[in-house]
Amino acid sequence: SCGYPCSHCGIPGCYPG
């Protein structure tokens, strides 16, 4: 989890949390 939306993560398969 990135802790922010995938659209801001830039990493495929990522999710908020």
UniProtKB/Swiss-Prot annotation:
GO terms for molecular function: toxin activity. Its main location: secreted. Keywords: Amidation, Disulfide bond, Neurotoxin, Secreted, Toxin. GO terms for cellular component: extracellular region. It is found in: Secreted. The modification Glycine amide is found at G17. Contains 2 disulfide bonds. The keyword Ribonucleoprotein does not apply. Expressed by the venom duct. It comes from the Eukaryota. Negative results: does not show effect on Kv1.1, Kv1.2, Kv1.3, Kv1.4, Kv1.5, and Kv1.6. Does not show effect on muscular (alpha-1-beta-1-delta-epsilon) and neuronal alpha-7, alpha-4-beta-4, and alpha-3-beta-4 nAChRs. The cysteine framework is XIV (C-C-C-C). May have neurotoxic activities. Does not show any effect on voltage-gated potassium channels (10 uM of toxin tested), and on nicotinic acetylcholine receptors (5 uM of toxin tested). Does not show antibacterial activity on both Gram-negative and Gram-positive bacteria. This is Conotoxin Asi14a. It comes from Conus asiaticus.
